[in-house]
Amino acid sequence: MTRPTGHASVSRDPPDLAPDRFLNPNCQLHMHTDAIVVLTTVANDDEAVTLVRELLDRRLIACGTLVSGARSLYRWQGKIADEREVLLLLKTRSARLDALQEAFRELHPYKVPELLALSVDTGLEKYIEWISGETSLSLT
């Protein structure tokens, strides 16, 4: 298929996917990892940064991504609440989940914090290795 006059031709055929030609050695996939992504929410950016920094200091997570402006609608104490929150995506390993749960009891500002752990089945090998290294018990 070609574009109108004045534009370069665009091929819709798939590229040659030969591994030695296409893949960056840092982009190899790691299957069946022990990595997890933990979801939680807090009320504002200040609470989010405070929580993530403390979890990083304790090596309970390798990374915390803050997604400001999330809107949560939920039932709480018999009423429907509609709140702006900050969603946190916490990258860690399943081996750190018990310690992370204990830290949530101590540090999380909510009475009933969201703590949902999602298994990461597949990820870039270097990234998975990085998560493991940053949350290693031997480094605490």
Predicted regions, residues:
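Compositionally biased, intrinsically disordered low-complexity segments enriched in Pro/Arg/Gln/His
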Residues: 3-4, 14
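Positively charged, small/polar-rich N-terminal and surface patches that mediate targeting and assembly
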Residues: 17-140
